[in-house]
A protein has these predicted regions:
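Conserved beta-alpha
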Residues: 1-207
Length: 207
């Protein structure tokens, strides 16, 4: 099968030196980019309905840039001033680096794992008399839940945002040789937008 068109279910990279640019030059293929899902923040009213009292938590568990953005967005909307003494437990260096958009980086209050909270076990246990809050979307990775529970700390989840299906109706009559997905939610979006989708000769690539 000769591949001429590819649809990537993610935003277009801002870097012109991405692997996709190399594919386009080398194989003369057309690559389009389109988000199949996107994130929406919950309203202050929706968060209040969860009875979240931010003042009770001196430690925040951050798993992604979205969790960072929506934690500070909703606390501002609810007029809660995040105390300077708040400690942040970041799943990765990328999350910790992004956190600097909102706070001054200090080693004493920002703890960074190597894509795994297990790396921070000793630090979590050090503060096991305090409460921890994890800002999340609709769900949290089961491995993270298992890890945090194993530390025997007092932690709670607060849904501050949600992942929703993007409108792809304008692609109804557009066909691609390959569709590339990066999460089950992307595939779910495909079938919610196009319930009668037939794969036929289209190739499906998953990451």
């Amino acid at each position: 099968m000769s591949v001429k068109t590819i649809l990537i279910s993610q935003p277009k990279p801002t870097n012109d030196n991405s692997p996709y640019s190399s594919l386009i030059r080398k194989h003369k293929v057309k690559i389009d980019f389109r988000k199949f899902i996107h994130v929406e923040g919950l309203t202050a009213k929706e968060v209040r309905a969860q009875r979240v009292d931010f003042s009770k938590f001196h430690n925040v568990i951050l798993t992604s840039r979205n969790s960072v953005d929506h934690f500070f967005r909703i606390t501002e909307e609810m007029r809660f001033k995040v105390p300077d003494r708040t400690k942040y437990f970041c799943q990765s260096e990328a999350v910790a680096f992004y956190l600097q958009k909102y706070v001054v980086y200090r080693k004493r209050k920002i703890y960074v794992g190597n894509n795994n909270f297990r790396d921070l076990e000793a630090t979590f246990i050090k503060f096991n008399k305090e409460r921890f809050l994890a800002p999340i979307s609709g769900s949290l990775n089961p491995d993270i839940i298992k890890t945090l529970d194993s530390f025997e700390i007092s932690w709670d989840r607060a849904q501050l945002y949600k992942t929703v299906v993007s409108d792809l109706s304008d692609l109804r009559d557009v066909y691609y040789d390959i569709l590339v997905f990066f999460s089950p939610l992307g595939i779910e979006s495909l079938f919610k937008n196009f319930p009668d989708f037939k794969q036929n000769k289209t190739l499906i690539a998953v990451y």
